[in-house]
Amino acid sequence: MAATDLERVSNAEPEPRSLSLGGHVGFDSLPDQLVSKSVTQGFSFNILCVGETGIGKSTLMNTLFNTTFETEEASHHEECVRLRPQTYDLQESNVHLKLTIVDAVGFGDQINKDDSYRPIVDYIDAQFENYLQEELKIRRSLFDYHDTRIHVCLYFITPTGHSLKSLDLVTMKKLDSKVNIIPIIAKADTISKSELHKFKIKIMGELVSNGVQIYQFPTDDEAVAEINAVMNAHLPFAVVGSTEEVKVGNKLVRARQYPWGVVQVENENHCDFVKLREMLIRVNMEDLREQTHSRHYELYRRCKLEEMGFQDSDGDSQPFSLQETYEAKRKEFLSELQRKEEEMRQMFVNKVKETELELKEKERELHEKFEHLKRIHQEEKRKVEEKRRELEEETNAFNCRKAAMEALQSQALHATSQQPLRKDKDKKN
């Protein structure tokens, strides 16, 4: 036997011994204690409704819980898909239920439907993250924490009678690892029974061929194994919703009145509404809550903790302590921080160098422009000086001509003034 096998044998816990009691102790009341505590604490159940606008999501919710939930009228012109949660306090007998209905408003209404699933996935992850953060608190209070994790997704399929839309396949494929999906055919009274049967077979075949994992009612519990196995064969449920009461015979029943007859909501020959209500609420509600916590949330939690550096040890290695994980993550963070600082410093140096080169280039351009303007100025100054010199020469020449002209004029004037005097002298002589 190998050394590791010996270690495993030596470290194995001894089998507990079975003992008989000599009298009544009292721990047989544990189930009653658990029931009493659960009833006092109350229950929460969160339903996500995904389907096109006007397909009957709100009507079905009102029909399922036999009440009228206040909801806003949805529009066909939503720019993007948005999640609208509404929480209600319900009570049946002495059981208190905090019910949250989350409607995917605007789903399938956009021209570009490539990312229609993204807001839904983000919302589900956000609820997981909120619960994880509450778990990681030093002083956590999960007892009175309002659990908003989605327990079931009712996926409403348009009753085309042909096949699933690509949007439906893509969305359910993105959601199947995050939430329990129950596909239902809405407004099932719009297609015939034969077409409905073929449509169900077509839908299940497409889901299997595309690897979409929908919620299967559990068959490991003997108390519900038989009914759940039968109901699994009826998926997807074809439902009709209505809050109106119609008189059929001598009693009022919830139904839809048509010119050709009445479709009774709770008549299993007309639709699968009763099957859906039984499977969703009466038989498997607790299993949906448990699957959400033990499967979908645990998968999210494990991925998040692995991202943080936590991991489970295998059988041959020592378990990782929180201190070791902290130190490893701290070193990793510090090295990453130093790397980022070096990158930023180098980026800053490169930016400074680029700025210096740009400034030098600007300086050179300004200097060249200055020299060019200086040469232009000197040339203009030379031209002005030359013009001034020419003007002075012309002015001097003009003054000289003017002086000569004035001298000639004075001589001529003097000569004309002497002529009469000479004539007078000649007469006297």
Curated annotation (Swiss-Prot):
Q: Where is this region: G1 motif?
A: 51-58
* GO cellular component labels: axon; myelin sheath; presynapse; septin complex; synaptic vesicle membrane
Localization, UniProt: Cytoplasm; Cytoplasm, Cytoskeleton; Synapse; Cell projection, Axon
Question: Which residues carry the post-translational modification N-acetylalanine, per the record?
Answer: A2
Q: Does the keyword Cytoplasm apply?
A: yes
Report keywords, A-Z: Acetylation, Cell projection, Coiled coil, Cytoplasm, Cytoplasmic vesicle, Cytoskeleton, GTP-binding, Membrane, Nucleotide-binding, Phosphoprotein, Synapse
- Record keywords: Nucleotide-binding included? yes
Kindly give the Pfam families that the UniProt entry links to this protein. Septin (PF00735)
Tell me the first and last residues of the signal peptide: none
According to the record, the residues making up region (G3 motif) are 103-106
Q: Where is this region: Disordered?
A: 1-23, 409-429
Coiled-coil positions are 320-412
What GO biological process terms does the UniProt entry carry, in alphabetical order? regulation of intracellular protein transport; regulation of protein stability; regulation of SNARE complex assembly
Q: Which domain of life is it from?
A: Eukaryota
* Entry-linked InterPro entries: G_SEPTIN_dom, P-loop_NTPase, Septin
Compositional bias per record (Basic and acidic residues), positions renumbered to this chain = 1-16
In-chain residues carrying the UniProt-annotated modification Phosphoserine: S10
Q: What does this protein do?
A: Filament-forming cytoskeletal GTPase. May play a role in platelet secretion. Seems to participate in the process of SNARE complex formation in synaptic vesicles.
**What quaternary structure, including any partners, is listed in this protein's UniProt entry?**
Septins polymerize into heterooligomeric protein complexes that form filaments, and can associate with cellular membranes, actin filaments and microtubules. GTPase activity is required for filament formation. Interacts with SEPTIN5. Interacts with CDK14, SEPTIN4 and SEPTIN7. Interacts with VAMP2; the interaction inhibits interaction of VAMP2 with SYP. Interacts with STX1A.
Family membership: Belongs to the TRAFAC class TrmE-Era-EngA-EngB-Septin-like GTPase superfamily. Septin GTPase family.
Protein known as: Septin-8
Q: What is the lineage of its organism?
A: Eukaryota, Metazoa, Chordata, Craniata, Vertebrata
